[in-house]
């Protein structure tokens, strides 16, 4: 799936000033004030000065990020005025999957389809600014390609993320400062590629909660449409147990792979790709994750499915705080005790834990249906699984049976002739 796309659309040459600086570097820029006058765009000023006679002087003009509306999500738009070795452009940034279908649990792999949605939304929302742009020379600044491994449930998926926190290989280094409970990242800040693994079901649930917390009157139209899509129980069920592997690819990676920089050249490249258009996205992903997945070979991890135990503890030991929030702290503490019994054995835990705390915790565990005999014989000996078997990214199983590829609402001939570009 193409999970994120950043397009940089240059301005028409008549609006761009070009020169070489004293060191021979190419410098180009566009007059933001003139662009604003022609397009009706609103700019921000770094400095505003008032003279005694009332004259107003504005300097340091810039264009802040703004959002273009679409049916399901916004497109981030920003104008860059240019500089040394950087052409002035309009940058568009969004998840094509969210634009086209309201979610990115799975989604399209066609650059042509994704680009049509970007250009169509841009032309519809800001036709005057669109007319100032040289659309056919659009370049790609970043592509996120994403595929998922499916495990039995979210409990096991959490174990996979925990294991991945200790994995790195070759030029793929873990970014420790950006670890979260359900996310692990490698190579943050790289100009080549950044890799991320995270739990999709957790992200979907967090997005739903975030939208539901807003008053209905404060939701935008596209947020309401998005919430309706995310509330689909089939979609939520499909997201359970999905471990998402996302590669955020930058221009240096494009060069190493042999991918063109210009967007319409990429469209043609994909159309003519030897093994098929879908496989271009697969091959980009495989190349980006090769070092990491090589590190998986020969690695084993303990896999335990204790989701029923955890659910029973949540049901019996959750409480409501004074502020009205639900607290799972006691259930989590008891589950941690249960996991110690699994990993260290009953006798070892009994000998190393404070006696009163041990017996109280044991009594509370047995109150949810576990017998003392069971707790004395927990073992992980039969749960060792090769990591490459656990993390199986099957490219033929990336969509549910009911998936239908979305279609752009925009007419290609009214936006830009992709085939003729």
UniProtKB/Swiss-Prot annotation:
It holds the Pfam family Phage_CRI. GO terms for molecular function: DNA binding; DNA ligase (ATP) activity; endonuclease activity. The keyword Nuclease applies. GO terms for biological process: DNA replication. Keywords: DNA replication, DNA-binding, Endonuclease, Hydrolase, Ligase, Nuclease. It comes from the Viruses. Its EC number is 3.1.21.-, 6.5.1.1. InterPro entries: G2P (IPR006516), G2P_C (IPR022688), G2P_N (IPR022686). It catalyses: ATP + (deoxyribonucleotide)n-3'-hydroxyl + 5'-phospho-(deoxyribonucleotide)m = (deoxyribonucleotide)n+m + AMP + diphosphate. The keyword DNA-binding applies. Belongs to the inovirus G2P protein family. Isoform G2P plays an essential role in viral DNA replication. Binds the origin of replication and cleaves the dsDNA replicative form I (RFI) and becomes covalently bound to it via phosphotyrosine bond, generating the dsDNA replicative form II (RFII). In turn, viral DNA replication initiates at the 3'-OH of the cleavage site. After one round of rolling circle synthesis, protein G2P is linked to the newly synthesized ssDNA and joins the ends of the displaced strand to generate a circular single-stranded molecule ready to be packed into a virion. Isoform G10P protein binds to double-stranded DNA and prevents hydrolysis by nucleases. Additionally, G10P is an inhibitor of DNA replication and may have a role in the transition from semiconservative replicative form DNA replication to single-stranded DNA synthesis in the life cycle. This is Replication-associated protein G2P.
